[in-house]
């Protein structure tokens, strides 16, 4: 999956 930043 793609990296997610929250």
Curated annotation (Swiss-Prot):
Sites of Valine amide modification: 6
Gene Ontology molecular functions: hormone activity
Annotated keywords: Amidation, Hormone
Known role: Inhibitory action on contractions in several molluscan muscles.
Family: To M.edulis MIP I.
Designated name of the protein: Contraction-inhibiting peptide 2
């Amino acid at each position: 999956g793609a990296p997610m930043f929250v």
